[in-house]
Amino acid sequence: GQMLAMAGIGDWITGTLERSGAKVRSVIPEEGGLQFTESFSIGKGSQKADLARKWIQYITSPKGQVKSANMAAYPCLIPSRKGWELLAKETPEEAKRQGMLLNESNVMDMIRNGRIKYRQLPVQQSLEDWNDFWSEYKGA
C-alpha cells in the first residue's frame, strides 16, 4: 500500500525503514516540531556503578555516538561536533541520511532557527488538564 503522511514517532523508524529499502523520509513541517532527548543514568545504590559509568563514557564519546547512529533498530542523532565529523568520515551515507553534515543544512540549523523545539520537562498537570489535552488531540 501507500502512505502519504503519518504522525511522527522519531527519525529512528524512518532510518530503519529506509535501510530496508522503503522509500520514506522524515520531514519537519515548516510550522515546526518537537525534539525529545533521552538520557542515561546510574541508579542510587547501583552495585555496578563503575561499569555503568564506563559505558556512559563510551556511548557519549564520538566513537560510541557513531555506533549509536549506525544501530540497525534505533539510529539516533549525535549531539557532538566530533561525533558528526567521525560519522561523516566512517559512514557518510548515514550522516547524509540523518542530516548530520556540517557543510549542509542540518538538524542543528533547524533547532537554531526554532523549527525544532525541545520538549519541556514534565510538570505535574492535573488529571483534568491531561483529559482536556487528550480530548483536544483526538479531535484535531
Annotate the PLM regions:
Residues 2, 10, 17-18, 44, ...:
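Sec/Tat-exported extracytoplasmic proteins
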Residues 34, 43-111:
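Mature extracytoplasmic/periplasmic domains
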Residues 107-140:
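Conserved C-terminal helix/tail region of periplasmic/extracytoplasmic solute-binding proteins
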Residues 10-14, 39, 52, 56:
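A general structural signal for well-ordered alpha-helical packing
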Residues 20-44:
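Periplasmic-binding protein-like
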Residues 1-29:
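Ligand-binding pocket segment of bilobal, Venus flytrap-like solute-binding proteins
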Residues 8-9, 36, 130, 134:
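Tryptophan-centered motif/residue detector
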